[in-house]
Design a protein with these regions (language model features):
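N- or domain-start disorder-to-order transition segments that initiate the globular core
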Residues: 25-45
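Extended, H/D-rich, highly charged conserved domains that either
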Residues: 165-167, 172-297
């Protein structure tokens, strides 16, 4: 009888252990793997920005120099942006019956990719494969850079094409080695603009002599977005949600668009400090996203919208992890809309070989020449 009682007690103890919260049983945490690394963890800096295409008309990309100088000092080995990769664009385009029209996100990219593929007589994947092979060689010649620009255009990677093109001497920016006159015009357009992809990512890659920039943006997750009409109606019926989305509540006014407008050179550093502060990350996540899934009026629609947002950010974090795989202990920089920053950093912190570099510390640093 005593043995039977002991057996029952042991079984009950096992059941109680299984019933405990996962945290109480010390669930596997990938981030703990960093403690056993044989070398320093790979560094990732996630720089949050307000999309510069939407900046006030007075904004001049030259105002960004204090930030750019510090980024040059950080000297990333790879640079990623919120642009979609050519591979994802092609996939969405192929599955447009399911995924929708990729052209609404990157119509010019798809158009020039089609033209370049026709001119070169290759497919997008073949163009990317050839570009990868050419980048593994010795220091590229002018002819190599022109060829790479053509291949990147065909692969749906116009910002990488611009990165190669702008590393050519102006006299070498010629329509040859696969570049047609039309392609020359288009690649030059992709290298001009005040949006952060061009004015920050491409400009920095050119200055550092990097071969390309990587698109980490995602719209595969759009397929799980809630019905737009129903979601819009639910939001319009929720003034408290609108106030948070517009950052019109007293606690959010400091983070509103007017407070963060880049309307003068001396506003750049304060705005970047705010957008990359933990306080902004928490407040913005609550206002834009968590509030949606906490609203009884939005119900399942709000939760579905947040699910799509999380899926989008998880995919972006995945791209960062893939791109950093070949550079263990190296440095990566992701330039992205500030709303993404807190989520992507949280997901990257779960990785076994990633450490997040502090943007506030970078902005507060005073490197020589900055």
């Amino acid at each position: 009888m005593t043995r039977r009682i002991r057996s029952i007690v042991a079984c009950a103890a096992a059941v109680m252990t299984l019933a405990q919260p996962i945290s109480a049983r010390q669930a596997f945490d990938p981030a703990r793997g960093r403690s056993g690394l044989i070398a320093p963890a790979t560094q990732v800096m996630v720089l949050g920005v307000s999309h510069l295409d939407n900046a006030p008309k007075a904004f001049d990309p030259a105002w960004l120099e204090p930030v750019m100088c510090r980024l040059r000092t950080y000297a990333p080995d790879v640079i990623l942006t919120e642009a979609m990769s050519g591979e994802q664009l092609a996939g969405i385009d192929a599955y447009k019956a399911v995924r929708g029209d990729a052209g609404k996100w990157a119509g010019p990219t798809l158009a020039i990719a089609g033209d370049a593929q026709a001119a070169l007589g290759i497919t997008g994947p073949d163009a990317m494969a050839q570009a990868n092979a050419l980048m593994t060689g010795s220091t590229p010649t002018a002819a190599d850079r022109r060829r790479l620009a053509a291949l990147f255009l065909a692969a749906g990677e116009p910002f990488s094409a611009a990165t190669q093109w702008l590393q050519l001497d102006p006299a070498e920016r010629l329509a040859r080695d696969g570049i047609t006159e039309t392609m020359k015009t288009k690649v030059e357009r992709f290298g001009i603009g005040r949006g952060e992809i061009v004015s920050m990512a491409v400009a920095l890659a050119v200055r550092l002599g990097l071969p390309r920039v990587y698109g980490a943006g995602d719209h595969l997750s759009d397929v799980v977005l809630p019905d737009n009409a129903a979601f819009g109606a639910a939001v319009r019926a929720s003034p408290e949600i609108i106030a948070q989305l517009d950052k019109a509540t007293p606690s959010l006014l400091f983070f509103g668009s007017k407070a963060l407008a880049l309307d003068a050179p001396d506003r750049v550093m304060p705005v970047f400090r705010t957008l990359n502060s933990p306080a902004f990350g928490k407040a913005d996540a609550q206002a834009q996203w968590l509030s949606l899934q906490q609203s009884p009026k939005l119900g399942a629609l709000g939760r579905q919208r947040v699910a799509a947002w999380e899926a989008q950010n998880l995919r972006m974090a995945t791209v960062v992890r893939e791109v950093t795989a070949p550079i263990p202990s190296g440095k990566a920089l992701l330039i992205v809309g500030a709303a993404h920053k807190a989520f992507i950093e949280a997901y990257l912190r779960m990785m076994t070989d990633i450490t997040i570099v502090s943007v506030p510390a970078m902005l507060d640093s005073r490197p020589t020449g900055c």
